[in-house]
Amino acid sequence: MKKNLTNIYLIGPMGAGKTSVGSQLAKLTKRILYDSDKEIEKRTGADIAWIFEMEGEAGFRRREREMIEALCKLDNIILATGGGVVLDEKNRQQISETGVVIYLTASIDTQLKRIGQKGEMRRPLFIKNNSKEKLQQLNEIRKPLYQAMADLVYPTDDLNPRQLATQILVDIKQTYSDL
């Protein structure tokens, strides 16, 4: 049972549009958008790639868990999570208990296109050679976790962030009277 429905969490793979949709949700609701990866970078003063290089994935996931714990204590926020946030059971529990969880999906081709457009080929878990295979691997592992957490699911291949954000808010209001 959810304790708090005032937060909206966006989960899904890299390139699904979490930050783009989150930005529109924040504008429409007059809430603050947090991007967990950007918040980690702000707190540490280092970019995610550097953290992965110096501390490995385990070090990054520890920092991510601490950041999620801090952000989940806030009220009335929009949070765009990192794609791997679902790998940690504590993250899944905190997110599920403190807000509405929106799972944004995207095809591998859409993800590749968006990641390439943003110049994000340097993402730590994104291997430029075999990038399609790497995304498929990550999706196979993470998809069941995303699905288990999701309150609402939206495909974003034909994404118009503003229209999707508007639809999400309509659906949330129809589903949950607390928001």
UniProtKB/Swiss-Prot annotation:
ATP binds at residues 15-20, 122. Its main location: cytoplasm. Catalyzes the specific phosphorylation of the 3-hydroxyl group of shikimic acid using ATP as a cosubstrate. It is an enzyme of class 2 (transferase). It comes from the Bacteria. It is found in: Cytoplasm. InterPro entries: P-loop_NTPase (IPR027417), Shikimate/glucono_kinase (IPR031322), Shikimate_kinase/TSH1 (IPR000623), Shikimate_kinase_CS (IPR023000). It comes from Coxiella burnetii (strain Dugway 5J108-111). The lineage of its organism: Bacteria, Pseudomonadati, Pseudomonadota, Gammaproteobacteria, Legionellales. This is Shikimate kinase. Keywords: Amino-acid biosynthesis, Aromatic amino acid biosynthesis, ATP-binding, Cytoplasm, Kinase, Magnesium, Metal-binding, Nucleotide-binding, Transferase. The gene is aroK. Belongs to the shikimate kinase family. Its EC number is 2.7.1.71. Monomer. Mg(2+) binds at residue 19.
